[in-house]
Amino acid sequence: MKLGDFLLKVIFWSGMTQAEVAKKCNISTPALNELIKNKRGINVKYAKSFEELFGIPTMIWLMWGNIDELNKEE
């Protein structure tokens, strides 16, 4: 499962809309949508925001993003 797929599931389980998540994380809705579609990589700012909102540690988000990047290189 790619990071974007996981993020979409977490958002669904949270009961929030993508727009609500973007607003609470102080990121644009298009940027969040690009993350979900795996068109944008995660960064520390996003990972910290997701930790604060969802309780999933920053390192998990960053490691998952790194795994996605490594898989692209293969």
Predicted regions and their residues:
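Helix-turn-helix DNA-binding elements, focusing on the entry/boundary residues of the two helices
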Residues: Q18, T29, V44-A47
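Short alpha-helical "recognition helix" segments of helix-turn-helix
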Residues: E20-A22, F50
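Short, charged recognition helix plus adjacent turn
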Residues: E52, M59-E74
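Short, basic-rich loop-to-helix N-cap that marks the start of a DNA-contacting helix
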Residues: K39-E52
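Recognition helix of helix-turn-helix/homeodomain-like DNA-binding domains
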Residues: N26-I42, W64
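A short, Lys/Arg-rich alpha-helix, primarily the initiator
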Residues: M1-M16, M63
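Residues in the helix-turn-helix
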Residues: E20, A31, I60
